[in-house]
Amino acid sequence: MATIRCARPVLQTSHRLFQSHNQRRTFLPNPFAAASDASSTPQTLTAHRTLSFPSAPIYSIIADVPSYASFLPYCQRSDITHWSAPDKTYGRRWPSEGVLSSGFGGITESFKSRVYCVPGKYVESVGGDTETSLSRDEIAHHLEDAGVGSRRSGDNVLLKHLRSKWTIEELGKNKTGVSLALEFAFTNPFYAALSGGVAPKVADVMIRAFEQRVVALLKENPAMVTASLADLDGSRLKR
């Protein structure tokens, strides 16, 4: 009797060995792809503190830009190159333009900033082509010198957009709210990538440093606690 042999069926796999040309996968992803988006669009970081001191000395300490390099992390130098005209309320001159040197994420850069102080309320600094968010009436004492108002800090290599804005709000006799909003955009993805691990922490680090300085100065100099802005000169009483 003849033996009947059946051919073994061919097993078909459900796995596709090839993908269509429309489903191409990037073999080597661009490490700067995300950073490129971050460098072109300004990022905003915020931080807030409530301090148990009057608002006047807190504001004066925050507006004391020449002292930043002595206590502020990442700030290596802070020089004021122009001062405002005396404001109409306190007769004080305020920082109006400065050169700050900062370093973080392996990058060190010096850049010009225009500074705008609304006594007792705001301290704002802007760099590059960034415009102030404050009204002309609020910063009239900064605009009396037309040359300052028209200056642009377009020579910054590190940042193409920069705005830091301190808001000081009196919440009670010895209670003050302090808020910091920091906007920045790097000039290219390389800088954004290098600073990626550090940049998100900057606002909180800055406001913590100011908080510590306020507490230290006012405990060492109790007379500053009750002083008005007219009696203060930066981080000390007028002599």
Which residues fall in each region the model found?
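Beta-strand/loop substructures that line and gate deep hydrophobic ligand-binding cavities in soluble
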Residues: 127-205
